[in-house]
Amino acid sequence: MVAASGTQRTRTVGLARWIVYAGSVFAGAWLATQLFYLVQIALWSFINPGSTAFMRTDAWWLSHDKPPAQIQHQWVPYDQISRNLKRALIASEDATFATNNGYDVDAILQAWEKNKARGHIVAGGSTITQQLARNLFLSREKSYIRKGQELIITWMLETVLDKERIFEIYLNSVEWGRGVYGAEAAARYYYRIPASRLGAWQSARLAVMLPKPRWFDAHRGSAYQAQRAAVIARRMGAAELPQSQ
């Protein structure tokens, strides 16, 4: 009995050590990942991102098309993007972007209630900064784990970058259709003009597309797009643009 008891204690101690070791490895890997994100964001204070997680995933799929296709993306400076588009996106996606801290608590709570009622994730209540966090580093998968990581990256973005820089990166990286990324590519793809020349109505229609850009690309001129664009156009005058610091 004594020998059996000793063996049991040895096994228990061994299991505890293994759990501590595994936990330490997991924690170390998690911290290393967060540090990687933070360093990347710090570099983007003065270096433009070459691509995003969404772009890289799309590029892989497009390369397997027949015939192979490529990502459409061209970075342009903030002041070369129409103020109409900036106002339309803020009016549509995040009315308090210029003054919030990257989170809209009311929208998050509303999304939580909606998801609970549906039994699965259908809404995220994401601000512009949260959308950027997801586009830069994460996947299109909808899960609470991914949402948690999105919130952490959002805090990093808001802490390290000013609002205008966040918006500049967002404008240059958001998806506007399969393989179409950024304001310049979208303006040329849909209207054959540079982003600097986008008018109010064109900008409002582009803003409507963001929740489901691929669907709207395939269903151009839908009645809903026109109706929603009219609502956004009316709100654009009140949209507050961020100021550089």
Curated annotation (Swiss-Prot):
Gene3D superfamilies listed in its UniProt record: Biosynthetic peptidoglycan transglycosylase-like (1.10.3810.10)
Keyword tags: Cell inner membrane, Cell membrane, Cell shape, Cell wall biogenesis/degradation, Glycosyltransferase, Membrane, Peptidoglycan synthesis, Transferase, Transmembrane, Transmembrane helix
GO CC terms in record: peptidoglycan-based cell wall; plasma membrane
EC number(s) stated in the UniProt entry for this protein: 2.4.99.28
GO biological process, one term: regulation of cell shape
Pathways per UniProt: Cell wall biogenesis; peptidoglycan biosynthesis
Transmembrane segments: 13-35
Cell wall biogenesis/degradation among keywords: yes
Classification via Pfam families: Transgly
GO molecular-function terms, A-Z: pentosyltransferase activity; peptidoglycan glycosyltransferase activity
Superkingdom: Bacteria
Catalytic activity: [GlcNAc-(1->4)-Mur2Ac(oyl-L-Ala-gamma-D-Glu-L-Lys-D-Ala-D-Ala)](n)-di-trans,octa-cis-undecaprenyl diphosphate + beta-D-GlcNAc-(1->4)-Mur2Ac(oyl-L-Ala-gamma-D-Glu-L-Lys-D-Ala-D-Ala)-di-trans,octa-cis-undecaprenyl diphosphate = [GlcNAc-(1->4)-Mur2Ac(oyl-L-Ala-gamma-D-Glu-L-Lys-D-Ala-D-Ala)](n+1)-di-trans,octa-cis-undecaprenyl diphosphate + di-trans,octa-cis-undecaprenyl diphosphate + H(+)
Topology within the bilayer: Single-pass membrane protein
Subcellular location per the Swiss-Prot or TrEMBL entry: Cell inner membrane
Protein family membership: Belongs to the glycosyltransferase 51 family.
Entry function: Peptidoglycan polymerase that catalyzes glycan chain elongation from lipid-linked precursors.
UniProt protein name: Biosynthetic peptidoglycan transglycosylase
Organism field: Burkholderia vietnamiensis (strain G4 / LMG 22486)
Gene: mtgA
